[in-house]
């Protein structure tokens, strides 16, 4: 049954899960995650007329982007607690900060997703872009936007790296074997790497080399660095972990 | 105790459940389903006067229709995870899409239920129909309405069929016996059949043979096809499964 | 450990619980109950000024009445599923109706509690009664109020009696002993008795013997019948159950 | 495994937990706590323009204060039920009162945190203080504010002390050893001490020795007494518990 459980969860069966029994921290966190995605979608006005109904359908793409991002964070949270089952005060404190940052960024994320959908909708000719509804669309505001989301993304992944660092600190008590220790260290580094991209974007935005939209466009596109970083890092770690498992 | 559990759940005792232990995906999904039915009912304005109170009671029938539909989807979700207990990334992705479609359609469903209740309330002489509060009641808007809900229903049942297809793909790992494999394949086909009705309705609406209300009335009544389809399909599968169990 | 569990739950240790393992129906229902009491309190406007803050505190008593009523219903729900652990389609259908009636009555309950608090607050000289904010305060509206809440209370306890009736029907499958069968039958009758009071109040209101406020005052005070009914019924059943346990 | 569980929970491994299996009271309470912190953050208006977005970011500090306070209460709730696993009627009643007080104070807490942030933001020169948006900022209103929050804090910790008193009353049934009895008695006293500070603040506010802002400033700063009280009390109890464990 052990092999089936690990595999049906799609996780690496070489890691023995300490957190199969759901704890209250996870039940509480699941309720907050569920509230976040639900209120993101259902905090809009209720369509009373046909016109309202079609207007509300315009938000489907932005909502899809936001829900996907939140679920990615939920999945990281789910894997962490499945692996270690930690419930100590430090983990609860870090978990609270994670949930707080998530909640603070639900509505700003909705704003950003609508804003980007309006821009890309126009670029791909799907809709007629009307950015005026977002208020004063200035370079200063775009810079603040990038700083705002850079801080949010940075905080989320920093907290995850601290949570994995916490698990690493309790490695003897959790009785982690050498493979599991390596896996934990890789998670710390992976999340620190995920932190570094928004940090870089933040720095570029604050330096603001061109003093105009080019800065914010660059700091926006920097987020595509996630793809190569994760591919390269994934290759390095999987090579090492295969060697560890053979030993 | 095994026989009692299967039977108290009202499920076919020949299927051994892999998902008796609740997982976080189910806890998270239950919170979203609970939010969906609650916000559907409680997102209306709070009655401050007697007049508000009676006006709010007018929504009871539309709400009952919506809550019943959402619970039918919840029950399908409940049975799927009880049967297979899957928690891998693909299942989580499909589950996220299912919850997202559900949330996007909560308010539109409320609109549709109110709109249909207004029409049928008038036909049965219960209330004086006043469709003006729904905005411009044109053939074009009704067509968009049918397309909108056709897509929603199509998406929900397509995701369920993909989830059962996922379970079918993991049949050796889940150690499904021949009866359970047959049951899983039947579920894939059942959900594909459930997909086909809204698809048919969508196509009729887009072709719009009459160019007036007759098209939307026909595409609406097509949904009654569910009854004969499910009865016939149910008979076929139960005959085959009895034969399988005897063998 | 068995004795401790029953006793820490404060339940009659002679009844062996079939539902100790939480099911998804209970997790889903708990989320709806939690949403009901939370939205009842938090659906008010957010205090932005000191004046708003004091105005919001005026609602504490009405909210306390509503939350107490909802928790009484939650406790009944909790005991039922703890006793029988049923998860079949009929139980899920009855549970859905129960949750639906609960949700439909959250805001009307808030209205009624505010209305009664305004009246009794004035009678006891705590506040200056101002019923004008509730709209047209006529005999006709009060009658509708009594009919409205009579139907709600009647529906809640009727569903509970049907749920216990369902458990009674599955007594052999649930392997209930004679004491447990007696306990289940008592629960059916108790809930039917709880149904009878709102039914009586409804009938009196519809007959409306005096054609003025005296009718609604009488149909309101009929609810105090709950106390003697439950005391007398409690005595009868505990006598019989003691005899059953001795045999 | 026992030692690991206690330690990963960060609790004193000398206390054997009776409540490892999550009960419905905890699932229900977790949903209410999750709703409290989510609605606290997400009950604000949704930012539609850049200006709204920056205005909404101004609330981050006040929200952080409120979420931290609510999580401290959640942690106390979590530890209580983990230790004793009680589910009897008295515990459910006390738990309901706790959740009710929590819900009633979510919005007032949001008001207080915004108010204090405005004042301290001005003192530390971070923002330009504008207290006019809070309505009439008089000595009378500040007194009512201190009374209001004094009652809330008093009620929360009084309920916790009653819950621990309930566990103490069931010590033989829960089979508590001498160390666990001492730990339970300490929790009663600790919560009564936590009650005493808001009580003292309340009394000072009602006596109102200076008849001006000095009274409310004093009654506000009294809350800093929590720190020395908890340090001294912590030292006394840990000395006694070490001696008990040695015996």
From Swiss-Prot, chains A, B, C, D:
Motif RxxxFSD motif, chain ranges:
24-30
Q: Which Pfam families match?
A: TMEM175
Q: Does the keyword Transmembrane helix apply?
A: yes
Write down the position(s) of the site called Hydrophobic filter residue 2.
Answer: 39
Q: Which GO terms describe its cellular component?
A: plasma membrane
Site annotation (Hydrophobic filter residue 1) points to: 35
What reaction gets catalysed by this protein? K(+)(in) = K(+)(out)
**Positions of the site: Hydrophobic filter residue 3?**
42
Example GO molecular function: potassium ion leak channel activity
Question: What is the top-level taxon of the source organism?
Answer: Bacteria
A biological process (GO) annotation for this entry? Answer: protein homotetramerization
The compartments listed are: Cell membrane
Q: Please report the record's description of how this protein sits within the membrane.
A: Multi-pass membrane protein
- Similarity-based family: Belongs to the TMEM175 family.
**Subunit record text:** Homotetramer.
State its role: Potassium channel; forms a potassium-permeable leak-like channel with weak selectivity for potassium. The channel is permeable for K(+), Rb(+) and Cs(+).
Name under which the protein is recorded: Potassium channel Ftrac_2467
């Amino acid at each position: 049954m052990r092999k089936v459980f690990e595999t049906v969860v799609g996780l690496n069966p070489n890691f023995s899960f300490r957190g199969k029994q759901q704890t209250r921290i996870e039940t509480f966190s699941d309720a907050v995650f569920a509230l976040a995605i639900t209120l993101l979608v259902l905090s809009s006005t209720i369509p009373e007329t046909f016109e309202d109904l079609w207007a509300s359908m315009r938000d489907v793409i932005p909502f899809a982007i936001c829900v996907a991002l939140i679920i990615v964070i939920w999945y990281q949270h789910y894997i962490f607690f499945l692996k270690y089952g930690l419930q100590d005060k430090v983990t609860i404190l870090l978990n609270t900060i994670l949930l707080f940052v998530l909640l603070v960024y639900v509505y700003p994320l909705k704003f950003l997703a609508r804003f980007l959908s309006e821009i890309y909708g126009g670029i791909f000719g799907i809709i007629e872009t009307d950015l005026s509804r977002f208020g004063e669309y200035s370079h200063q505001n775009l810079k603040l936007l990038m700083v705002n989301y850079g801080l949010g993304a940075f905080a989320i992944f920093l907290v995850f790296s601290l949570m994995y660092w916490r698990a690493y600190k309790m490695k003897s008590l959790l009785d982690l074997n050498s493979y599991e220790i390596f896996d934990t260290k890789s998670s710390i580094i992976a999340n620190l790497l995920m932190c570094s991209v928004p940090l870089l974007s933040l720095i570029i935005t604050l330096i603001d080399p061109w003093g105009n939209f080019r800065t914010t466009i660059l700091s926006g596109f920097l987020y595509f660095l996630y793809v190569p970083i994760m591919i390269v890092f994934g290759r390095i770690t999987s090579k090492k972990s295969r060697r560890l498992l053979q030993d």
